[in-house]
């Protein structure tokens, strides 16, 4: 036996190495010293030929197959009867629940709702899915549902339930809750009662404990969701409820249709109240209507238009959605905040989140009328000369009928002049932003927002087509000034009132789902892409829902203002050992993260690059239903008026940029 073979045997437990396997000495000799050195630096490279290729991202066949399956609504006559979950799903179907957004958990309920044919979307985080449901409702006015499992899934939804509560969204919050039999035992993930957790964040809530009352409590839910001032309703389902079986309707209590458990009747203004309102408006020289949430939810934009045009009344839209009075209209005051101090009469219609006089720019001496569907809130925060309990549509229909024809040329001229001044300020801000961008080789927020504005409203795209949303601090405040709403449900104010960081992308994926389905006011633009402006701080919370957008082919263009910091970084200036808490790593590649989730990614630093990226991203979204994240590199110092004037400008309220009310 040769010396070489003997050494080989020693290394292989007495078995000679096959001739096809080179020795380490032979391998190194054959590849040469340089290759060996390279392998030590990058050991994977030398064996790359034997590494299988990384498979491409793809949508599982089961997704498209199951979405194409026939619907099934449970029936008492079926073998074994119908489950409590199917009873509840049938109630949701009868009530035209618009959509469900969820993560796995509460399995029997979400499965039954989806099987019944209600559009259902499964995502990556319960909190983000709650915001998606909220966004769907904000651009349609319809009731939507979200769902999560008990324990961690439910608690993950809390911030987003709070966001919906402040926006008065008709959101049906569903969650499983282990079993009644295991109450007080800390059984598995049942670590607390849900209803106390949502106290103060809902209009109504109930833990279901009687299986035969499941339909009755569905009625409670939809009665609250579809009458009065809307708000979240929270139901939690122990296992005894959704697993119960019924073979005939008589086994359920209070089992009858929606025409018997709630009414479509709405309060109308008392004749004397309507007459007084007409008289006050007719006597005023500069009246303005604040058209809030209720005008949108009650689909009252047509009588609003008739009343405004008939009597030359200025209109400013307010709330978590915009467009129920078009921004381009000569009577729109949404871009004329400098004119508000001239108003001598303010008519609040459907303004559910009332400001104080100090928060809004109206003349504190102006007279005030407020129209609300319930009486208990009238007079809160803003002293009234006339409070009217009425459905918003009924009141506006009354105005449209009873107001006389009247021209207010001076008032309309003042609105136009104020608008010109406002738009001039925007252009001045943009010109400063161009200089800052060119000096830093990054992109200022005003440049980003004007480019989006010009692309969506000044180019070849129908200006009414694209639903937009905005969030973040520096980019959100700027974006709100530049985005426009020319028809109902065209703009979603993501941070409205609660000012939460992070729901923006998820909320707009929900809005995108509504556009893809063509629900309500989105019907004429069914299939169009949506666009959202957000921040590097905000994208953290819902970026993984780009996977959800890809899975359901919801095309969204997401513009991320990457300024390497929380927007509140100036709060650390001058304080020792503080700034590090406000900063991120610089130049993070959110575009690369998006690519890893099945979306496109674009990274831009200049105005020309952004313009090209925006055009390409929108075209891909429209033609291929593929989403894109555009990572726009900026500087944190753009927030500072001292470093880069004008800095971050807080928008006047009410106006296109308002978010507090």
What are these model-predicted stretches?
Residues 1-11:
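N-terminal acidic, proline/glycine-rich, low-complexity intrinsically disordered segments
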Residues 182-190, 331, 340, 379-381, ...:
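Thiamine diphosphate
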Residues 4-5, 16-18, 32-40, 46-410, ...:
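N-terminal alpha/beta PP-like core and its mobile active-site loop of ThDP/TPP-dependent enzymes
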